[in-house]
């Protein structure tokens, strides 16, 4: 699971995910990628599940880059606890993805049809709409 080693603040406000991504919207490492089409919170377990699906589909060939990291803690109070008495403890970590953000990349030594299949399978494991992008036209 992806968890930061150290964080400046233990807990953060919920906030809103507004606008499009400022950076990280183009392919930087590989020739094929998975781009977010809508805003959403991606948990560390979603990233790990998508990574496993991609590596199994590619049969360990090629290189996979994970372009995101969950750096925002989400707190939750236990069940059957009354309101008040402070904020709950940190339950999991998320990455707040904006539309246009590149999530995963795959190297060019993998055939395009296999890369597309792997990234479409990974899309099913993520809580948002995504699309396949490539450097090849």
Curated annotation (Swiss-Prot):
A GO MF annotation of the entry reads: tRNA binding
Q: Which UniProt keywords apply?
A: Ribonucleoprotein, Ribosomal protein, RNA-binding, rRNA-binding, tRNA-binding
Read off the Pfam families from this record.
Ribosomal_L16
The record ties this protein, via HAMAP family, to: Ribosomal_uL16 (MF_01342)
The family note in this entry says: Belongs to the universal ribosomal protein uL16 family.
Its assembly, as annotated, is:
Part of the 50S ribosomal subunit.
Protein name according to UniProt: Large ribosomal subunit protein uL16
The UniProt gene name for this protein comes to rplP
């Amino acid at each position: 699971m992806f968890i930061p080693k150290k964080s400046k603040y233990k807990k953060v406000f919920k906030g809103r995910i507004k606008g499009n991504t400022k950076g990280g919207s183009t392919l930087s490492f590989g020739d094929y990628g998975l781009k977010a089409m809508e805003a959403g919170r991606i948990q560390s377990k979603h990233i790990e599940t998508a990574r496993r699906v991609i590596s199994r589909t590619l049969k360990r060939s090629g290189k996979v880059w994970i372009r995101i990291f969950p750096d925002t803690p989400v707190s939750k109070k236990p069940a059957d606890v009354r309101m008040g008495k402070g904020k709950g403890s940190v339950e999991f970590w998320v990455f707040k993805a904006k539309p246009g953000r590149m999530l995963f990349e795959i190297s060019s030594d993998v055939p395009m049809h296999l890369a597309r299949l792997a990234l479409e399978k990974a899309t099913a494991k993520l809580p948002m709409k995504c699309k396949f992008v490539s450097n090849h036209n």
